[in-house]
């Protein structure tokens, strides 16, 4: 198992915070991995004491998105509700350039951006 994924899995083994993140208007979070399922991102954020988190909804370095399973998304949303994790921020992939002067690249960027919005 790659080292970074092992670390991500280790976070899931952490005990729940002794004191849940405070429920204030000020939120602090991290960009967390969706490795092992999108629902794990919410669990990781909670376990380290965050009140918000950010994810890539698909690979940040590829045009071709992968589908997120509806049950996993529902589970993530249930965990967000349970742990009061909000907002969830979706980071678009690195390839998107909505200012491109290349028509082909702009079309791919537009399609990828729309996909990100739909997954959000």
Annotate each language-model stretch with its function.
Residues 1-92, 96, 100-118:
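N-terminal pre-domain/capping segments
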């Amino acid at each position: 198992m790659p080292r970074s994924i092992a670390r991500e899995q280790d976070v899931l083994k952490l005990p729940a915070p002794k004191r849940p993140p405070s429920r204030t208007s000020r939120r602090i979070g991290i960009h967390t991995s969706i490795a092992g399922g999108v629902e794990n991102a919410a669990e990781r954020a909670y376990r380290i004491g965050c009140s918000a988190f950010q994810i890539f909804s698909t690979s940040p370095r590829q045009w071709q998105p992968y589908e997120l399973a509806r049950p996993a998304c529902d589970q993530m949303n249930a965990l967000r509700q349970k742990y009061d994790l909000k907002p969830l921020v979706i980071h678009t992939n690195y390839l998107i350039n909505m200012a491109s002067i290349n028509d082909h690249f702009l079309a791919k960027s537009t399609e990828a951006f729309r996909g990100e919005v739909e997954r959000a």
